[in-house]
Amino acid sequence: MFAPRLLDFQKTKYARFMNHRVPAHKRYQPTEYEHAANCATHAFWIIPSILGSSNLYFLSDDDWETISAWIYGLGLCGLFVVSTVFHTISWKKSHLRMVEHCLHMFDRMVIYFFIAASYAPWLNLRELGPWASHMRWLVWIMASVGTIYVFFFHERTGSCVQFLRGEACPKAGTACLPARYKLVELLCYVVMGFFPALVILSMPNTEGIWELVTGGVFYCLGMVFFKSDGRIPFAHAIWHLFVAFGAGTHYYAIWRYLYLPSTLQTKVSK
């Protein structure tokens, strides 16, 4: 967040690519350029994610590998598909307020399940200690809790039913997007992203650890841009790219260290 302070893009020729920053309790409205970039930067990865997920499925040797490939693939593809659909509707059909709101909620919810799905192959296919094995189901509880939080606190102070009916906030003049809820949501993503990693790092087999760390660094760097709408042009699209780089690095680790070795040694593909 320090970089934007060093350079005020609103005073440069790049100002036309972004709107002014809004208060923390309001949602930033992207420019037409930013809308297009937000859609393209995740739409581009839909086909590769489908192909990559299919590759893991065909490399699977047993039921656990197959199940893990399905879980991870659905989480990976779901992330890019839901994000692309939401940003497209937000750009071209913003007058469909209820549809846009629901898709925005799904866009936030799917992140929790993507995080859980990204850990699934490691937790299902690697040897775990007695206490660490509980993380297999704990990570899904965390994703469910995050989803419930989004449902009740995303972009409103009034009830979900009131918002979806198009009714005004119960208190005129109050913010419908409390800043504290956005901060808690971001902290939830960070905690859920790092907490299961403690188990991964404690596994006897440490192959793939550096790739996992590298992917995590991409996500962390991307968060700088995630919170920089109105400060940096195309900030959200840049965040999308960091997500794609992080996901790609983690995919490589899963493919290389959980699926490829057994393929080279033992089997014929399905």
From Swiss-Prot:
GO terms for cellular component: Golgi membrane; perinuclear region of cytoplasm. One of its GO terms (molecular function) is protein kinase activity. InterPro entries: AdipoR/HlyIII-related. GO terms for biological process: positive regulation of neuron differentiation; positive regulation of protein kinase activity; positive regulation of Ras protein signal transduction; regulation of protein localization. It is found in: Golgi apparatus membrane. Keywords: Golgi apparatus, Membrane, Receptor, Transmembrane, Transmembrane helix. Residues 1-38, 87-102, 154-182, 227-233 are cytoplasmic. It is a multi-pass membrane protein. Pfam families: HlyIII. The chain crosses the membrane at residues 39-59, 66-86, 103-123, 133-153, 183-203, 206-226, 234-254. Residues 60-65, 124-132, 204-205, 255-270 are lumenal. Its main location: Golgi. Shows restricted expression with highest levels in brain and testis. Belongs to the ADIPOR family. This is Monocyte to macrophage differentiation factor 2. It comes from Homo sapiens (Human).
